[in-house]
Regions:
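Short, T/G/N/S-enriched strand-turn elements that build extracellular solenoid repeat scaffolds
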Residues: 11-18, 31-38, 50-57, 72-79, ...
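Well-ordered beta-strand segments characteristic of repetitive beta-sheet solenoids
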Residues: 1-8, 21-28, 41-48, 60-67, ...
Length: 200
């Protein structure tokens, strides 16, 4: 059934929270280190989120909203088998060794560092800064926008069209691997540097 949790602090370290239907969590501070929180429709609103080695799962949808400074997803997994919406425009996400996975992903964040972002269909990522990504993949169209310079160092794959815009400069790094199956549009107000292999 539906489950609603509204509290000043939710500590689920090593614990499990499960809802067969809709789960609403509203808390300024969430500690899900090594824990698991899953629901059919998962709505999470929190200022400070620690999901280190934890699991945040939406079996049909996951909506994550944060107005905090940091989201710790080191070694963690943020997964939706349907739509994954992340709205955290001023939040720095450390996803080193972690996963952000969904059928359709729309993420609007302050910054994201490390880890893998994989969408089975559409992927839209807007960030002031993105760095040290291990892999970014979409089964269909991919759209990435960053304000700062963006060095693409990991593996990038798009099954559809790819639109990549980095206002502060864009670099395809030599250690990066880039494969885009349809049209690719790359733009920057500053510069574009290619040190890798770019193919479409």
């Amino acid at each position: 059934e539906d489950l609603e949790l509204d509290t000043a602090r939710l500590d689920n370290e090593g614990g499990n929270i499960h809802s067969g239907k809709t789960l609403h969590i509203n808390t300024p501070e969430l500690n899900n280190q090594g824990g698991s929180i899953d629901a059919t429709a998962h709505h999470l609103q929190s200022t400070a989120i620690n999901n280190e080695n934890g699991h945040l799962i939406g079996r049909e949808s996951l909506t994550l909203t944060s107005d905090g400074e940091k989201l710790n997803n080191r070694g963690g997994q943020i997964i939706s088998k349907g739509k994954l919406d992340i709205t955290a425009k001023d939040t720095s996400i450390d996803s080193s060794g972690g996963y952000i996975v969904g059928k359709n992903i729309a993420a609007d964040v302050g910054s994201v560092s490390g880890g893998k972002i994989e969408s089975w269909e559409e992927l839209t990522l807007r960030a002031k800064k993105a760095e040290k990504m291990e892999s970014v993949r979409s089964g269909r169209d991919m759209k990435i926008e960053t304000q700062d310079k963006y060095s693409m160092t990991g593996q990038y794959y798009s099954g559809g069209e790819a639109v990549i815009r980095a206002t502060g400069g864009l670099e395809f790094a030599p250690e990066g691997k880039f494969e885009f199956n349809e049209n690719i549009k790359v733009s920057s107000d500053a510069y574009i540097i290619n040190r890798g292999l770019l193919s479409s």
